[in-house]
């Protein structure tokens, strides 16, 4: 009898292990989109300090902005909730590349270098880079004039890279407001930034101590970066589908007008 009990127990344990293994294998076999849907949420990296793309409302302190609301709408159309993780720009990109975050919504522009690390969705907005200096400045009138100068930008941003490519020394600053302060007090000679953000800053603050002195000829395309690999193919397709539907039904345009006063979703 004792022997039979031991054999029966062994069979039960073996059966449990096999079932657990099957369950684990089943979970491992699911791609990124399936895991997101199973979790009921999609984690979104964002700065929360770069108006009007991602920032906190002054009255409610609620996280909002063009990219934030676009991400929320995408999540809604995927049938899940958007869970935001705030941090610096470079950390957000690193988190996506390592799989810590599912995606990033933060005015991330598509570049060849980033294309080696990330799989991008279709672009959902378009912009141009501009050079901003103190009003009255006559020494800097183009991107080439930044050589030997100091610019203020977020670490890891395309704008910081542009500054370095034009021979500038880049000071890393976490927020747009701090960036502008460094330019105004002379700590930085200039900043390269998104035209939309600069225009919003100038209009919102009424600041007349700054000026735009140059605009990049190339159009900046904003898209959502995902960790590179086939595991993300279905998620990218689903997000692309959501973006296409948002363009078609006017939702994307409405969000743009709400935060920029114009439609930047068309090239």
Model-derived regions, located:
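C-terminal motif of bacterial Sec signal peptides marking the signal peptidase cleavage site
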Residues: 16-21
């Amino acid at each position: 009898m004792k022997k039979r009990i031991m054999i029966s127990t062994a069979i039960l344990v073996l059966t449990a292990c096999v079932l657990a293994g099957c369950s684990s294998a089943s979970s491992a076999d699911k791609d990124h989109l399936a895991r997101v849907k199973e979790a009921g949420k999609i984690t979104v990296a964002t700065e929360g300090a770069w108006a009007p793309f991602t920032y906190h409302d002054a009255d409610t302190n609620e996280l909002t902005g063009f990219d934030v609301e676009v991400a929320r709408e995408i999540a809604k159309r995927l049938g899940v909730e958007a869970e935001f993780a705030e941090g610096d720009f470079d950390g957000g990109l690193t988190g996506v590349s390592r799989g810590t975050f599912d995606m990033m919504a933060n005015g991330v522009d598509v570049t060849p270098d980033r294309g080696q690390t990330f799989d991008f969705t279709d672009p959902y907005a378009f912009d141009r880079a501009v050079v901003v200096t103190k009003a009255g400045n006559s020494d800097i009138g183009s991107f080439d004039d930044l050589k030997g100068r100091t610019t203020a930008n977020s670490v890891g941003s395309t704008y910081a890279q542009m500054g370095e490519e034009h021979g500038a020394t880049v000071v890393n600053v976490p927020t747009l407001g701090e960036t502008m302060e460094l330019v105004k007090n002379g700590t930085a000679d200039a900043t390269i930034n998104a035209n939309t953000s600069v225009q919003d800053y100038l209009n919102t603050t009424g600041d007349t101590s700054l000026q735009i002195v140059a605009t990049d000829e190339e159009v900046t395309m904003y898209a959502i970066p995902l960790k590179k690999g086939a595991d993300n193919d279905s998620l990218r397709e689903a997000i692309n589908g959501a973006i296409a539907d948002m363009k078609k039904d006017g939702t994307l345009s409405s969000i743009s007008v709400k935060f920029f006063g114009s439609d930047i979703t068309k090239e």
